[in-house]
Structure formats: C-alpha cells, structure tokens
Regions:
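Loop-helix junctions at membrane interfaces
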Residues: 1-209
Length: 209
C-alpha cells in the first residue's frame, strides 16, 4: 500500500470512528420503524470493513463496543450489567462475561461483513448484480452477527439474571431472547442491508473519481 492510500484509509477510518461515536450518543443511531427503533450504529462498522478491510473493520467494531461499555457504565439501565463489569443493579452485577458480550460481537461485525462481501462477490462472478447482492448480504450478515452473538451470549452468561432484570422471569428466558431477535434483530438486519447498499455504492463512485 502506498503512502497516499494509507493516508486516505486512516482519514476514512477517523471519519467512521466519529460517525460511530456520534450515532452512539445521539438519536442519529436509530431509525423509527413504527413498531420499534432500528439500531444502525453498526452500519459504519460494516461499511468501513467493506471499504478498508477486515483489520479496520475489527478496529471500528472495537470502537462501537467501547461506546457501548461507556454508555452502559455511565448511563445504566436495569440490564446494563450484561454489558459492563462496572455496573451493579440491585443484586445483579457485571463481570468478565460483560466485557465479552460488549466487545467480541462488535469486533466480529466488520470481520464477518468483509468476508461475506468478498465471498458473495466471488460466488456471483460475472453477474451484473454481484456488487449490490454482496453489499446487501454483508449488511445483513454483519447486523445478524451482532444480534445473534449478543443475545445468545447474554443467555449463556447471564440467562437467569437477565430474565429477572428485564422481565421478572425465571423460566422461558430463551423465548424472550428469540422474541428480541425476531422483533428487533431481523428488521435491523434488513435496514442494515439496505443502508449498506445505498451508502457504499455512493462511496465507491466518489472514490473512483
């Protein structure tokens, strides 16, 4: 990589970092769908990974995780202990598992999105729609990576505590997890796929000029 490209990538990474931070702490990180607010904070991570590569994707995901850690530590809600080891809500407190939930899925968002994008491009070689389909698949895959890993890690590491804190439940906790994945995760993945296609294609055109 020449110096010019390296500088360009660092500037783009800084812009994506700024977007993630702004979206994490303002309403810009959410799109109202009527029945829910779709989280789109992970979209800059996905797009950054596609444009800059998996290493930058992992870095941007780490920034997303750090904003989540800070927010859940300093602006806690009843279930913030699953995202921060520094939070204790009544009889429930966070631990090392909280850091795993907060950081690992977010770091993997960009890495998964990048390799899905490249894999679909290769699989559809020769198709006029290959880039559009690959971008949509990367957006959906990156979003679902976050949702599926976060919610399943919550269940395996804090199942009973999360059920009690969130819904006052001691049984049927995984049904709640599945409900959240279906009601929140799937619409968010669709939105992420649409935004990834629209924004990344526009960025590709700008970068070619």
């Amino acid at each position: 990589m020449n110096t010019g490209n390296k500088t360009r990538d660092m500037v783009l990474a800084a812009i994506f970092v700024a977007l993630i931070i702004i979206m994490a702490f303002t309403p810009f990180g959410y799109i109202p769908l009527g029945f829910m607010n779709a989280t789109i904070i992970h979209v800059p991570v996905i797009i950054g990974a596609i444009i800059l590569g998996p290493k930058y994707g992992g870095f941007l995901g780490m920034i997303f995780g750090l904003t989540s850690l800070w927010k859940n530590t300093n602006m806690p809600n009843p279930t913030s202990f699953v995202f921060s080891p520094f939070v204790k809500m009544g009889e429930y407190g966070g631990n090392l598992g909280s850091l795993i939930i907060c950081m690992v899925p977010r770091i993997l968002i960009g890495i998964v999105a990048y390799y899905v994008f490249r894999g679909v491009l290769k699989a559809l070689k020769g198709s006029k729609m290959k880039t559009t389909v690959a971008l949509a698949a990367a957006g959906v895959a990156g979003s679902l990576t976050n949702t599926l890993l976060v919610m399943n890690l919550i269940y395996f590491l804090f199942g009973k505590e999360y059920g009690q804190a969130a819904k006052g439940l001691t049984e049927g906790i995984y049904s709640v997890i599945i409900g959240i994945i279906c009601m929140n995760g799937i619409p968010e993945a669709i939105v992420a796929g649409i935004l990834t296609v629209a924004i990344t294609q526009a960025l590709f055109k700008v970068m070619r000029n």
